[in-house]
Amino acid sequence: MGAYRASMASSFSLVHSATLLKNSIFLRRSRVLAFSLHLSPFSTSSATLSSDVLHAHKKSRQPVAATLLELGGVKVARDEIVKDDPTNNVPDSIFSKLGLQLHRRNNHPLGILKNAIFDYFDTTYPNKFTKFDDLCPIVSVKANFDDVLVPADHVSRSYNDTYYIDSQTVLRCHTSAHQAELLREGHTHFLVMGDVYRRDSIDATHYPVFHQMEGVRVFNPADWEGSGKDGTQFAAEDLKKCLEGLAQHLFGGVEMRWIDTYFPFTNPSFELEIYFQEQWLEVLGCGVMEQDILRRNGRTDNVAWAFGLGLERLAMVLFDIPDIRLFWTTDERFTSQFSKGQLGVKFKPFSKFPPCYKDMSFWISDSFTENNLCEVVRGIAGDLVEEVKLIDNFTNKKGMTSHCYRIAYRSMERSLTDEEINDLQWKVREQVETKLKVVLR
């Protein structure tokens, strides 16, 4: 499932950092959302507003020309996605990424990786798996959460973590949002690739838009009868064989190990790790699909497996790409390195511009969240912001809490001037104070 960790992510979340160290790349934080990639009221109600401060003020928008996009065959106007509405938290910076579909570009690292994975399944399972890479990222709250067993009160539903278009519609947090629909349509072997959206921190391995792949295979009783195994055991063994082959296809003859884990939508659940560049790296999350999901979609007698992985995380390792922002650059010095569309090309850095650091201290309010801060900073500085990091905090005798954040500005393509940085920082301070209701120090 795309909900299996892999960004996401935690993709929900399922791969961040060129070295993919266990504690820094495959972060556990989004486990319930992601296999990122998330037990069991199945309510379709949306989460309560957790970012009241942001919604208490009319969003400040940069002037943007009216735009009409086609997303998965659906035509969508900007004002249908970005609204001055208390139930909407989608900024222009996110709208600008819709429809770019980096994963469908054959000469882009994400497209190259996607094609390599598709090639593996086409070769190993000829004419079996149906592939989807152009499904609309606008989905219902029900599809995004309820259909994959995310509880109504789970933190992943909050406005602090998810981009809501309105109270019942979101930008998908994971490719698992399409799982139930595809099962209902009768698909039994499918791969889903797409862009997914999550409000997140700012550093070299996190970005609010990333890409996931979900894989599902459904078995009938006839498939395991006579094998001497029950359906769950049969599916689990088939799943491991499939994914071990995929890991070898991408990384070569590496040592592997399976880790038992927990996901709310699979049982049993596993993580696959490989020993690569002298580190154990988590590659993906997977498991045997919960029977409740199958029953809800008309497959009472079936058993299925599912997996999810994050493309950026794997691509950063396979191509030696050090900063997740590079996937979005149009600089020819980056794009030309992948013009042959081949797996295994190692990225050659073309700039070593130094970062510029600016510190900002303020007294926080009870409603303050770091994701809200990062959203404000990114909305002003865009991809010029490299990292937002908490470097100090304390609480005084009156119970007031102060945070000090260090913001690193750096362009991947050019040197930034002092005047430019100072102007950005001034705007950031102004907007943080106004939108987040903090008191600057």
Model-derived regions, located:
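Context-gated lysine
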Residues: 22, 58-59, 75, 83, ...
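A carboxyl-terminal module marker
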Residues: 252-441
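Residue-identity detector for glycine
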Residues: 2, 72-73, 99, 111, ...
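Surface-exposed, flexible loop/turn segments at secondary-structure boundaries
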Residues: 198, 223, 396
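Long mid-to-C-terminal scaffolding/interaction modules that assemble large complexes
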Residues: 190-192, 208, 212-235, 245-252, ...
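Prokaryote-biased recognition of long, low-complexity C-terminal linker/tail segments
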Residues: 105-108, 112, 141, 150-165, ...
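Hydrophobic, Leu/Ile/Phe/Ala-enriched alpha-helical segments that form helix-helix packing faces
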Residues: 117-125, 183, 243-251, 377-381, ...
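Class II aminoacyl-tRNA synthetase-like tRNA-binding/catalytic domains
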Residues: 2-212, 217-218, 280-294, 301-303, ...
